[in-house]
Amino acid sequence: YNTEEAHSLLEVNASHNDKDYILAINWKKAAEHAAKGDFDWKPCKYAHNVMHEDTEQATSEILNKVKVIDTRKYNDFLYLIPCPKSPHGVDVDPSGEYIVGNGKLSANLPVFSFTKIQDAIKNHQFDGKVDGINVIKYESALHGEVQSPGLGSLHTEFDADGNAYTSFFISSE
């Protein structure tokens, strides 16, 4: 999320602030809202694709409406987490506990904790709101930062031994 809300010359105009945002969605809570009917139907045309595991074939169906939850009414499932400079990829380790925010214009690599994020939400550790969405305090969500591993982290992948591998524009190796 581009905190400058720039709409032109993005690489220049959307890079002034030290931190932008990762939008975290509690999809289980969103599903609860949908199940309760807290949505409006909006017309649109899209392909709904389904992969059938038994036949290893996919089918497509063209649909003409979608459920939309008005987040001005129901925003208890959306949270913003500050992340250094233009987050590109947000990657989760196999345990689901650690979330790496890859800021493509940052020299540091923040690692967030799912448990700390949940605690921050429960304890209302917010730094205000943006468009009605609570901003979780950076320190409240942060597990730690990898200092100066390179510049322009893009994505982090994990192996079975818990090691993380991050791709960069410029590496410090």
How should these model regions be labeled?
Residues 1-173:
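Predominantly soluble domains enriched in secretory-pathway, periplasmic, or organellar proteins
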